[in-house]
Structure formats: structure tokens, C-alpha cells
């Protein structure tokens, strides 16, 4: 995700 991009990129 753009907002929580540290844990999961997508």
C-alpha cells in the first residue's frame, strides 16, 4: 500500500 508501504508494497 502507498500509506503503509513499509510493511507491504502494493
From Swiss-Prot:
GO terms for molecular function: oxidoreductase activity. Its EC number is 1.6.3.-. GO terms for biological process: regulation of defense response to virus. The keyword Oxidoreductase applies. Keywords: Antiviral protein, NADP, Oxidoreductase. It comes from the Eukaryota. Expressed at high levels in BmNPV-resistant strains. Expressed at lower levels in moderately resistant and susceptible strains. NADPH oxidoreductase. Has antiviral activity against BmNPV. This is NADPH oxidoreductase. It comes from Bombyx mori.
Amino acid at each position: 500500500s502507498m500509506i503503509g508501504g513499509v510493511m507491504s508494497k502494493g
